[in-house]
């Protein structure tokens, strides 16, 4: 193995020496390596992957204490021992220890959960590890690219990411995109003997290659060593920072007001003032926020993977929740991609050829191994698949590529004559055969006939090769026939599209097939037939009715596009994003990569190429549209949990800061910082369970609305703060509870007032999560078992502390079960208005409140709900009449009805629903057949009439 050591040390120039010398130096042959040789070479060269930086577990743990929210808590800890002096008391060690414990608890939970999430993500990403076709033990097989070693023989084809640095063997030239490595914008041609680099993408061709370098020894590996990874600040991080900053600023304002009032105006003692400031710092900071949100995302990501959608980028979850347009491939996503040919409909164009021979030529122009769906269909149509190569010797196979859109086989028959058979897109084959005008007309007529039935067309041609060379152009091509391909829709596609529309997601079909096929498939799936050819995207459509319509508007209103090339997909995504839509795009091929990268959510479908997977945000492990729609629902649940928590966190900050500031300044009552710590620790323990809470997903696409989060948080927090102020006034200045419930008076008893105030703040603070987690009444939407259990346990502990604890250092004394019962009753009574405030804020933020007040003067009406239902019904009727639809049955609505508040779909989805409704009513064997026969009889234009159908 001495020679291999030199290769590992890069002492041999394998990039430039002749290919035969490469085999000598690597001690291998064109038959590849054995498994044993591969294992031995892994010991020498290592696995074919880049070395991951080992992160110190200790530094990672401490990293969770290094963020703006933690800094505020750490500042509070320093204040507790450095500034909290005087008044004849020692430094505040209890608070210092308590703050450190709180920080350690949060960091520990974050560390454990992120570690678990990281392990789960690593296991998921292992499923996405690049695979490659490698020749081992004399057999071709698909293996993980990480096992490759110098000397392995690999196969590289269209859409593959080159798995290692390699030298090309005999075969056709490849087109390689190495822009990611060298910056070259156009694909470069690589001939046999040339070197290809790990990480570049095959754009055209197919060839075998011998591996010469792996892992860190590759061109890509060396470049990666020179570049530090850049930390991109994602949208999620920006939102997190904005919410954290809002809380920090709120606390800072409270502290400044306290300092100004307590010291210069009230002349309060220094030590008491510092403790009041500590209360705001400790209680106001949502220290658990980064932990709760990251854990929620990690758990959600794992749930998505179980449903068949692996998220490569964690923050894609929030974009998936906000997606309102999904551009979906037809083949394989909306349909089964299980093709069949109706032999009775095969059209023969060449003399002396029967339908069976057309099928045989199509099978010859197909692969017998490593097949795609069309190859499998063609070979499968033969009585015996072996007939595809029976009696002939294969010389050269031209694989499919997006430019030529055809495959071809050069072969020698039993008599020694050379022939070529080709199958592919009819337009390409017509051009290849240089057909006459009458033949073209006949071909297009048959294609249209197929398309009206929803059938795709496949053309077959042949030629003789008198020069007997695979590189020669050969004789003239002869157009042989047309085959009809039927790709049945998935059984669940129609229902899934209906669900998507109800969820406010508009599904647009993007297909390379003809317009007529797209329309027929759209009609069958109930997604409407408002489809356009790709030429309409460039404003070149022959349809005069489209000329006046701006391209942006056309794309927005279309149900789909036909005859689409990958560059059109990019344009569709770009235009929709300019119209402020959150766009999802599915793709599977190497040419889809730009559109997948451009889309807000790039979705690589099941069996996508390596290039499509690397460009996407989400990789599907199961076929069909239903996986995507399930993922949308799950993402909205995850997003809802995160949004619920952020509203809760902002509310608690405002409630603590405002409540304790008012009590400290009005009655000069100094609440113990240690008791706020107890509230914070119990709160954080409970709130961690929200990541697994049972939630109702938003009925419409959702996104971070910071104005809604801050407005709701401020209103709910202010209300709770005022409730606490009223409660303290009742126990501090009156005997209200003593008179009404017969409990002992604790008026002006500082330690007992502290216990009572602690319990009241603890109960309502935690109960608030049930309000923020629900869209309707909090007692109607059942929370998760874990959340309820954690709440009850935390409040049991809080109640026991208030009832029994006699802690002089925290200035509390047990108040007994009588007072505990009174405080629970008080908290429950003042809990109910929280829901009403929540509904009111939502109503005000929707803008409808101001419209009603200013435009309709609804403040002075006597109608139920200020006539809201009646006006909405009038609007809906007007809209439906405008589009030729019957008005729905009138339904009653209420201000706080969840379905009423959120039932309006986005305008674009509503339009698609209407078109789908019309399309379904035009099914065959109903009005459609009769109408079309009359139209043809009268010589009218069916397309014009379609636009004027009314129901």
UniProtKB/Swiss-Prot annotation:
Catalytic reaction annotation: ATP + H2O + H(+)(in) = ADP + phosphate + 2 H(+)(out)
Keyword set includes Cell membrane: yes
Gene Ontology, cellular component aspect: plasma membrane
First-listed, main subcellular location of the protein, grouped into a coarse class: membrane
Residue intervals annotated with topology Cytoplasmic: 1-60, 114-242, 298-613, 683-708, 772-784, 835-951
Example of a GO biological process term: proton export across plasma membrane
Protein name in the entry: Plasma membrane ATPase
Taxonomic lineage of the native organism: Eukaryota, Viridiplantae, Streptophyta, Embryophyta, Tracheophyta
């Amino acid at each position: 193995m001495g020679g291999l050591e030199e290769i590992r040390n890069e002492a041999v120039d394998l990039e430039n020496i002749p290919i035969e010398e490469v085999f000598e130096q690597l001690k291998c042959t064109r038959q590849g390596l054995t498994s044993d040789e591969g294992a031995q070479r892994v010991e020498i060269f290592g696995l074919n992957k880049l070395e991951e930086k080992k992160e110190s577990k200790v530094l990672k743990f401490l990293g969770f204490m290094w963020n703006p929210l933690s800094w505020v808590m750490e500042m509070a800890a320093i204040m507790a021992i450095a500034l909290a002096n005087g008044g004849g008391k020692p430094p505040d060690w209890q608070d210092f220890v308590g703050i450190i414990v709180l920080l350690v608890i949060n960091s520990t939970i974050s560390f454990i959960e992120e570690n678990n999430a990281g392990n789960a993500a690593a296991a998921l990403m292992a499923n996405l590890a690049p695979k490659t076709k490698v020749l081992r033990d004399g057999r071709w097989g698909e293996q993980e690219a990480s096992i490759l070693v110098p000397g392995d023989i690999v196969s590289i084809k269209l859409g593959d990411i080159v798995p290692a640095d390699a030298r090309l063997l005999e075969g056709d030239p490849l087109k390689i995109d190495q822009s990611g490595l060298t910056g070259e914008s156009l694909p470069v041609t690589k001939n046999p003997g040339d070197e290809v680099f790990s990480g570049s993408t095959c754009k055209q061709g197919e060839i075998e290659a011998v591996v010469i370098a792996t892992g860190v020894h590759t061109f890509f590996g060396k470049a990666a060593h020179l570049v530090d990874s850049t930390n991109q600040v994602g949208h999620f991080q920006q939102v997190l920072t904005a919410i954290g900053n809002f809380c920090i600023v709120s606390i800072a304002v409270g502290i400044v007001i306290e300092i100004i009032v307590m010291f210069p105006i009230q002349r309060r003692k220094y030590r008491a003032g510092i403790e009041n400031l500590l209360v705001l710092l400790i209680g106001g900071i949502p220290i658990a926020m980064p932990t709760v949100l990251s854990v929620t995302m990690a758990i959600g990501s794992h749930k998505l993977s179980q449903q068949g959608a692996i998220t490569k980028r964690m923050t894609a979850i929030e974009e998936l929740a906000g997606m309102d347009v999904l551009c979906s491939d037809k083949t394989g996503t909306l349909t089964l991609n299980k093709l069949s040919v109706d032999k009775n409909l095969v059209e023969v164009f060449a003399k002396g050829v029967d339908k069976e021979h057309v099928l045989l030529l199509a099978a010859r122009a197909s692969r017998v191994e490593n097949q795609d769906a069309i190859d499998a269909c063609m070979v499968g149509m033969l009585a015996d698949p072996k007939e595809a190569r029976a009696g002939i010797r294969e010389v050269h196979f031209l694989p499919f590529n997006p430019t030529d859109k055809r495959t071809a086989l050069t072969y020698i028959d039993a008599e020694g004559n050379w022939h070529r058979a080709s199958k592919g897109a009819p337009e390409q084959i017509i051009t290849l055969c240089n057909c006459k005008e009458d033949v073209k007309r006949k071909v297009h007529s048959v294609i249209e006939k197929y398309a009206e039935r929803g059938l795709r067309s496949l053309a077959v041609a042949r030629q003789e090769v008198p020069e007997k060379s695979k590189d020669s152009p050969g004789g003239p091509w002869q157009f042989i026939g047309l085959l009809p391909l039927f790709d049945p829709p998935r059984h669940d596609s129609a229902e899934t599209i209906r669900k998507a529309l109800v969820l406010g997601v508009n599904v647009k079909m993007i297909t390379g097939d003809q317009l007529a096929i797209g329309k027929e498939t759209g009609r069958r799936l109930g997604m409407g037939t408002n489809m356009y050819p790709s030429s309409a995207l460039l404003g070149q459509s022959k349809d005069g009715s489209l000329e006046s319509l701006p391209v942006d508007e056309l794309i927005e209103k279309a149900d789909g596009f036909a005859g689409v090339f990958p560059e059109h997909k990019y344009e569709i995504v770009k235009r929709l994003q300019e119209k402020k839509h959150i766009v999802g795009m599915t793709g599977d091929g190497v040419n889809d990569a730009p559109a997948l990268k451009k889309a807000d959510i790039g979705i690589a479908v099941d069996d996508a190429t390596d290039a499509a997977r690397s460009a996407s945000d989400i990789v599907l492990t199961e076929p069909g549209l239903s996986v995507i729609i399930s993922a949308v629902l799950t993402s909205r649940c995850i997003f809802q949990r995160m949004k619920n928590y952020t509203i809760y966190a902002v509310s608690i900050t405002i409630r603590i800061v405002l409540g304790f500031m008012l009590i400290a300044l009005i009655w000069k009552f100094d609440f113990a910082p240690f008791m706020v710590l107890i509230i914070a620790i119990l709160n954080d323990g409970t709130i961690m369970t929200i990541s697994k809470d049972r939630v109702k997903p938003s009925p419409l696409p959702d996104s971070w609305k910071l104005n809604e989060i801050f407005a709701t948080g401020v209103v709910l927090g202010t209300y709770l703060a005022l409730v606490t102020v009223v409660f303290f006034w009742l126990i501090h200045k009156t005997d209200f509870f003593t008179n009404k419930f017969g409990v002992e008076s604790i008026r002006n008893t500082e330690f007992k007032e502290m216990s009572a105030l602690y319990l009241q703040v603890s109960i309502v603070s935690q109960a608030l999560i049930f309000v923020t987690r629900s869209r309707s009444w909090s007692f109607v939407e059942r929370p998760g078992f874990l959340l309820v259990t954690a709440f009850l346990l935390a409040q049991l502990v809080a109640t026991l502390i208030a009832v029994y604890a006699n802690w002089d250092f925290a200035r509390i004394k047990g108040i007994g079960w009588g007072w505990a019962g009174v405080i629970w009753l008080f908290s429950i009574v003042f809990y109910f208005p929280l829901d009403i405030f929540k509904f009111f804020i939502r109503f005000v933020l929707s803008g409808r409140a101001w419209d009603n007040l200013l435009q309709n003067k609804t403040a002075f009406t006597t109608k139920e709900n200020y006539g809201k239902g009646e006006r909405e019904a009038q609007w809906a009727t007007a809209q439906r009449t405008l589009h030729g639809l019957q008005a729905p049955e009138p339904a009653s609505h209420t201000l706080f009805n969840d379905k009423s508040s959120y039932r309006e779909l986005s305008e674009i989805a509503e339009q698609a629903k209407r078109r789908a409704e019309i399309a379904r009513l035009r099914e065959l064997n109903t009005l459609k057949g009769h109408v079309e026969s009359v139209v043809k009889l009268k010589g009218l234009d069916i397309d014009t009439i379609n636009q004027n159908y009314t129901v």
